[in-house]
C-alpha cells in the first residue's frame, strides 16, 4: 500500500517537472522567429479565412522532407495559386496546370486532383469550415480523421471523370490508422489562435480537440521524455501522446507541438 502511494507521489513530481520543462520549451520556440522558417508562413500571408484554409491545406500537403526544400516548393505552389487562392479555386483554369514537379513526388496532376475537390467544396459550402460543420467534424472525438475521410470522398468524387495517373498524394486513401501528421498540422494552424504563430480562423473547433502533428522529430523527443511508449508513428501513437499532453494542458494540448518539434530538431 505504502509503496503504491510513494510511487504515485513520485510520478506526480515527475509529471510536474516534465510539464515545467515542456512549458519552458514552448516559451522558447513558440515565437515569431520560429514561424519565419516554418511552412505556416504561407497561410499567414492572407487575411481572408478562406484563402488561409486553402493555403494551409495545400502547404501542409507538401510539408515533408528538408525544411529549405519545403519552403522553396511551397513558394512555387503559391505562384500557381496567385495572390487569391480562393479565386483560383473557384475560377482558375485548373486543367491548365502542367505536369511539372512541385515537391518531391507531388506533381501538377496531384495539385489538379486536390483543386477539383476543393472547387466542389467551396462552390457548395463556401468554406472548408462550413464543410466541416456540415459533416459534424467538430462533434467527433477525432475530428482530423473524420474530416480527412470525408474530404477524401469529395476528392475522389470530383475526379471521377478526370484522367489521373497514380495515387492522389493529397491524403492517404485509408486514413483510419495513419498519424495524419500534415493534416493535423493544418488543423493546428486553423484552430489555434495564439497571436504568435497559429491563426485560429475556425471558431467551431476548439484547441482542446486537436491532436499532436506527430513526425519523426516530435516522436523521438516524446519517447526520450517518457511521453510516448508506442514504437510506430501511427494514429495510436498520436492518441497516446495527445492524451498524455492533455493531462498537462487539457484546453490546448497541441501547444506542445512547438516544444517537441523544436527540441527534437535542435537536440535540446
Predicted regions and their residues:
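HhH-family (HhH-GPD) DNA N-glycosylase catalytic core used in base-excision repair
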Residues: 6-268
Amino acid at each position: 500500500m505504502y509503496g503504491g502511494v510513494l510511487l504515485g507521489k513520485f510520478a506526480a513530481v515527475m509529471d510536474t517537472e516534465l510539464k515545467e520543462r515542456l512549458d519552458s520549451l514552448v516559451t522558447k520556440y513558440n515565437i515569431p522567429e520560429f514561424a519565419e522558417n516554418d511552412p505556416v508562413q504561407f497561410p499567414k500571408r492572407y487575411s481572408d479565412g478562406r484563402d488561409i484554409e486553402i493555403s494551409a491545406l495545400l502547404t501542409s500537403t507538401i510539408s515533408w522532407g528538408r525544411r529549405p526544400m519545403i519552403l522553396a516548393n511551397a513558394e512555387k505552389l503559391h505562384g500557381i495559386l496567385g495572390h487569391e487562392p480562393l479565386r483560383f479555386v473557384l475560377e482558375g483554369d485548373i486543367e491548365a496546370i502542367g505536369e511539372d514537379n512541385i515537391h518531391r513526388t507531388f506533381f501538377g496532376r496531384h495539385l489538379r486532383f486536390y483543386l477539383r475537390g476543393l472547387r466542389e467544396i467551396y462552390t457548395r459550402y463556401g468554406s472548408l469550415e462550413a464543410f466541416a460543420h456540415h459533416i459534424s467534424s467538430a462533434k467527433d472525438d477525432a475530428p482530423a480523421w473524420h474530416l480527412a475521410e470525408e474530404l477524401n470522398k469529395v476528392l475522389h468524387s470530383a475526379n471521377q471523370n478526370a484522367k489521373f495517373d497514380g495515387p492522389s498524394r493529397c491524403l492517404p486513401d485509408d486514413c483510419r490508422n495513419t498519424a495524419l501528421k500534415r493534416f493535423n498540422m493544418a488543423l493546428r494552424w486553423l484552430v489555434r489562435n495564439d497571436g504568435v504563430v497559429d491563426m485560429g480562423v475556425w471558431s467551431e473547433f476548439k484547441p482542446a480537440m486537436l491532436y499532436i502533428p506527430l513526425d519523426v522529430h516530435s516522436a523521438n523527443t516524446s519517447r526520450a521524455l517518457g511521453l510516448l511508449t508506442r514504437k510506430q508513428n501511427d494514429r495510436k501513437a498520436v492518441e497516446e501522446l495527445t492524451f498524455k499532453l492533455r493531462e498537462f494542458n487539457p484546453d490546448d494540448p497541441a501547444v506542445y507541438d512547438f516544444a517537441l518539434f523544436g527540441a527534437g530538431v535542435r537536440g535540446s
